[in-house]
Amino acid sequence: GLLDTLKNMAINAAKGAGQSVLNTLSCKLSKTC
């Protein structure tokens, strides 16, 4: 239903945000930016 769709969108958005934060952190730590 609609709620499931919204929930999945929220989960995917959170995963995407977390991934970019992790990428930024590892990039800064290894100085590959």
UniProtKB/Swiss-Prot annotation:
Belongs to the frog skin active peptide (FSAP) family. Brevinin subfamily. Expressed by the skin glands. It is found in: Secreted. GO terms for cellular component: extracellular region. It holds the Pfam family Antimicrobial_2. Keywords: Amphibian defense peptide, Antibiotic, Antimicrobial, Disulfide bond, Secreted. Signal peptide: none annotated. The keyword NAD does not apply. Disulfide bonds join C27-C33. GO terms for biological process: defense response to bacterium. Has antibacterial activity against the Gram-positive bacterium S.aureus ATCC 25923 and the Gram-negative bacterium E.coli ATCC 25726. It comes from Odorrana hosii (Hose's rock frog). This is Brevinin-2HSb. InterPro entries: Antimicrobial_frog_2 (IPR012521).
